[in-house]
Design a protein with these regions (language model features):
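C-terminal non-catalytic interaction/assembly regions of soluble proteins
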Residues: 57-63, 68-167
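Accessory alpha-helical/coil subdomains and C-terminal extensions
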Residues: 1-82
């Protein structure tokens, strides 16, 4: 799991099963569905600092020290964010160790555009993508983190890209 530590984001080990092999309640991943729609921005432009709801959600997840993730419900059928500001924040979440899956709205029967740092959950509703992301988090754990999620290095991007591909 990842959490906000003293001045940076750190990776922490966490138990998933008890001595009898049963899933621990605290190990169940916390995966939120973030919806994006047309005209959702409060201001014109692509300033992520104005998207306080997503900033608060990312900060809350990093404060938990648990397995966490996001499913972005965007355009149908492509699953893309309409807002560049919200897309930038979802990339920051990924660079902070929080995996992001993207789906189309409603009951899409198409594809989600592939992205090197986001999971394209093609042919899935947001609920199904959420359950699969929870299973992936239990199997693979959190993504690698960048020391500075706003400015990841090339090596950090390579490690994150490789981990996202495993999902």
């Amino acid at each position: 799991a990842t959490r906000r530590g003293a001045g940076s984001i750190e990776t922490v080990e966490m138990a998933v099963k008890d001595a009898d092999g049963k899933l621990l309640a605290d190990a169940i991943p916390v995966v939120s569905i973030a919806k994006d729609g047309g005209y959702s921005g409060l201001e014109f432009g692509d300033d992520p600092s104005l998207e306080l709801d997503l900033i608060a959600s990312i900060d809350h997840k990093l404060g938990m020290g648990r397995l966490t993730g996001f499913v972005v419900e965007g355009l149908t059928p492509y699953g893309t964010n309409l807002s560049q500001a919200r897309h930038k924040l979802m990339l920051k979440a990924t660079f902070s160790g929080i995996p992001v899956a993207k789906v189309g709205r409603g009951t899409p029967e198409g594809f989600a555009d592939p992205h090197e740092f986001q999971i394209a959950a093609s042919n899935l509703t947001a609920i199904k993508a959420r359950l699969l992301l929870m299973a992936c988090l239990l199997r693979f754990g959190s993504l690698p983190t960048a020391k500075d999620p706003d400015h990841p290095t090339g090596d950090e991007l390579d490690a994150i890209r490789k981990a996202v591909a495993a999902y």
